[in-house]
Amino acid sequence: MNCYKTHECNELRKNDVEKEVTLSGWLYRKRDHGNLIFVDLRDFHGITQLVFNNDKDFFDEISNLKSESVITVTGIVKARTEDTVNSSISTGEIEVIVSNLQVESEVEFHCDEEIAKEERSILASIAGEQEYPENMRFKYRFLDLRREKVRNNIILRSQIISELRRLMIEQGFLDIQTPILTASSPEGARDYLVPSRLNPGKFYALPQAPQIFKQLLMVSGFDKYFQIAPCFRDEDARADRSPGEFYQLDLEMSFVTQEDIFQVIESTLYKVFAKFSRKSVDKDFPRITYKEAMLKYGSDKPDLRNPLLISDVTEIFRDSEFNIFKSNIERGMVVRAIPAPKTAEEPRSFFDKKIEHAQKEFGAKGLGYITFDKDGIAKGPIAKFLDDNRLNSIKEITNVKPGDSVFFASDKENEAATIAGKVRTLLGSELGLIDDDIFKFCWIIDFPYFVYDDKSKKIDFFHNPFSMPHGGLKDLEEKDPLDILAYQYDLVCNGIELSSGAIRNNKLNIMYRAFAIAGYSKEEVDTKFGALVRAFRFGAPPHGGIAPGVDRMVMLLADEPNIREVICFPMNQQGEDVLMGAPSKVDDKHLRELSLKVVE
């Protein structure tokens, strides 16, 4: 191939025996047998075993060479003896007897012994797959990426993105790039701002999403747009959210309904998940209204692998003798029931721990419970306050059987739903009810258009302000704002929100009215969203879109619990790039050029 290699380190086979070959790569493992030294040479593609004889003048050099140094070797391919064949690597039937060694780059540890100790330990993890603190891994990410598991995650990411692009182009979408330096947008998170040198006191914003631009493309006459879009949001890190930067399969279509968008996404993601995972993929993408999701699952991100369903049992406890719930109901609260199959025989500590966990971790004031023994007899602290009719109604509504239990959460409707949802998740996990070998998708639809913000004491948009309300202008003018639904939808997989989307509002009179309900004047809308307003005055087609998160898709397909494991150069949980030392201070000269001053 060239002076560095005739073959990759995964290529040589028995039919290459007696050939002279040249290989290059990293010294992965070294085994000293006195007169012989065996080296596993690793490149991007695989591993080949090298043999160094002590009669060569470079024997001492290879003997003293540190692991992960880069070398080029020339030698003769030999067949291994039957008892030394390594079936775990593709080149395991051969080895290369080295006749020439060239050291391309030797590992050198830092002169400071403490730093050198850190470097030795992280270097050793490449072969051993030993885990190290996240900050150390990210500081030496160039070494961390040499580990097989980490490298495979990045390869998988590349393959998934390539497949997404292929499938979108196959369906007639155009890959169009939108600006990175732009104006602040209303997605809801904090912006990353970039000062303008040529316009002192003014700032660009890095896009939280290409929302406005992709809508402008539809107004421009393009009917199918997509890109693997970089998005920037100043948010705190979570297991499923990387701080700072993330990527999404951003798409928009014109002259479409909600179902048209669903069909594109279902076809695309089913193919991607089926291709890149050994897990089964459920072809069914059920539609679940937001209201139903909050009632049955206690979350707008339900994990459908969990078979437990929450029930509303408020009416059963109304006017009952259980005064805690009775009093709550009289004050406008609700009661939700969560079944716990085959737990009636569990010790009291099982139930006490769930109650304590709900109080400490979920903010619950407490949980009630009833157990039904093998004969179906109700027991527990609540049972004695309920007559047989009420107990039978609980059994019927929650579908519990003899030997099962039921937990109860009572609070304001939203709080009770959230607590019940978290208890459902906890029970599903602890009772082993979740099938880890399947992907289950669902659509959450019919979100509220508006929400009442208790802090600001005013009505605000629940999600995307640019979505079309059900009923259009008529509903905005005649309905209670909190009863209006939106053509907004989320795609969820195994309890992880993959994306949000909407059918857009393409009519200015509806847009002005919607923003007016949220407290914005026409002048404010014109100022804040001038480009979109101008465009909509010149014929805007019905359009809609969605943007599944690429990082989250890869996280699910790689079966990783943390999204940072599938990002090549991630930030840590504090939003720091410890490899490059960002964020960093800027010198005064640079600040003056930008008309900025740091206030301590």
Swiss-Prot record:
Site feature location: Important for tRNA non-discrimination: H33
Amino-acid positions noted as binding L-aspartate in the UniProt annotation, renumbered to this chain: E187, R233, H463, R504
Q: Where does ATP bind?
A: R233, D234, E235, E497, G549, V550, D551, R552
GO MF terms listed in the record are: aspartate-tRNA ligase activity; aspartate-tRNA(Asn) ligase activity; ATP binding; nucleic acid binding
Task: From the UniProt entry, list the residue stretches annotated as the region Aspartate.
Answer: 211-214
**Reaction catalysis annotation:** tRNA(Asx) + L-aspartate + ATP = L-aspartyl-tRNA(Asx) + AMP + diphosphate
Q: Where can this protein be found? A: Cytoplasm
Q: Does the keyword Plastid belong to this entry?
A: no
* InterPro entries according to UniProt: Aa-tRNA-synt_II (IPR004364), aa-tRNA-synth_II (IPR006195), aa-tRNA-synth_II/BPL/LPL (IPR045864), Asp-tRNA-ligase_1 (IPR004524), Asp-tRNA-ligase_1_N (IPR047089), Asp/Asn-tRNA-synth_IIb (IPR002312), AspRS_core (IPR047090), GAD-like_sf (IPR004115)
Supply the alphabetized keyword list. Aminoacyl-tRNA synthetase, ATP-binding, Cytoplasm, Ligase, Nucleotide-binding, Protein biosynthesis
For this protein, the record's SUPFAM superfamilies field holds: Class II aaRS and biotin synthetases (SSF55681), GAD domain-like (SSF55261), Nucleic acid-binding proteins (SSF50249)
Identify the EC number(s).
6.1.1.23
An example Gene Ontology CC term for this record: cytoplasm
User: Hey, which family's this protein in?
Assistant: Belongs to the class-II aminoacyl-tRNA synthetase family. Type 1 subfamily.
Q: What does this protein do?
A: Aspartyl-tRNA synthetase with relaxed tRNA specificity since it is able to aspartylate not only its cognate tRNA(Asp) but also tRNA(Asn). Reaction proceeds in two steps: L-aspartate is first activated by ATP to form Asp-AMP and then transferred to the acceptor end of tRNA(Asp/Asn).
- Record protein name field: Aspartate--tRNA(Asp/Asn) ligase
What species is this protein from?
A: Wolbachia pipientis subsp. Culex pipiens (strain wPip)
The taxonomic lineage of its organism, from the top, reads:
Bacteria, Pseudomonadati, Pseudomonadota, Alphaproteobacteria, Rickettsiales
